[in-house]
Amino acid sequence: MTLLRGDDFFTSRAVTVAVEPRTPQTAFPEHYHDFWEIVLVEQGAGVHVFNDQPYALCSGSVFFVRDNDRHLFEDVEGLCLTNMLYRSPRGFRFLSDIAAFLPYGPNGEWQGQWQVNAAGMQQLKQSLNSLAGLAQSDAPEAIAASESLFLQILVQLRQHCFQTEGNGSERQGVQALLGWLQNNYSEEVNWGGLADQFSLPLRTLHRQLKQHTGMTPQRYLNRLRLLEARRRLQQSDDSITTIAHACGFSDSNHFSTQFRKAFSQAPKSLRHQAFSREE
């Protein structure tokens, strides 16, 4: 597995933050870093596999990545994102500790998958452009200004994001709906009911989901289900039928057809490959 080193991305060893745009982000194999980063997806689609857990990417997706996390990008389609790098939560010159602004849950668990709304993303892009300029200098005043702006960006993320691990029931709009789908993909979905739940006209729901994900709502839902099914096939001993039902497919034959269409491989073949690698 590849280790990405901060010396290849930060302007100098004195600099504590960096901005790395990826326009586009191509498929990239599993890797880890000796620094921390925040990944903000501006547009496009793809799959982000984070510590063996797959996530479907869309505009507004945000991922907080620690130095001990493993991740990769695959199945990308017009994916554009920006990486905001920092040494560590305590690796700043003028900030003492940013842990309070990082996505720790009430019991200390890491909740690093967020969704940001469109207005928030526009504000963040402006701040990131300014930060990219400041991060080119290792003058003390530039480092102080870049760390100050970095903290402002963390505050902006808090204001405009929410964790996709939550059920999103208290929030409205397409971003909340995306978070709900990430957490409830296995349920039977009534799009009209969800439109009411998230205060969206049904036609608006279909149009905005297509804009954010590049897919129709049903195709995006199936994508979430298939990604989770692939993970379970590789990591569990459950039968293919059990996995299909657990991921929201009522018919295992239909599941197998959809799986082959998405991954050019039958579920049984993937299961066999996964077990062969372990032997």
From Swiss-Prot:
* Pfam families, per the entry: AraC_binding, HTH_18
Q: Name one GO molecular function term.
A: sequence-specific DNA binding
Q: Which residues bind DNA?
A: 192-213, 240-263
Compartments (UniProt record):
Cytoplasm
Is this entry keyworded Transcription? yes
Q: Which InterPro entries match?
A: AraC-bd, AraC_XylS_family_regulators, Homeodomain-like_sf, HTH-like, HTH_AraC, HTH_AraC-typ_CS, RhaR_RhaS-like_N, RmlC-like_jellyroll
Q: Which GO terms describe its cellular component?
A: cytoplasm
Q: Where is this site: Interaction with sigma-70?
A: D251
- Tagged with keyword Transcription regulation: yes
One GO term of the biological process aspect: rhamnose metabolic process
Q: Which residues cross the membrane?
A: none
Which PANTHER family does the entry link to? HTH-TYPE TRANSCRIPTIONAL ACTIVATOR RHAS, HTH-TYPE TRANSCRIPTIONAL ACTIVATOR RHAS-RELATED
Q: What is this protein called?
A: HTH-type transcriptional activator RhaS
Quote the gene name from the UniProt entry: rhaS
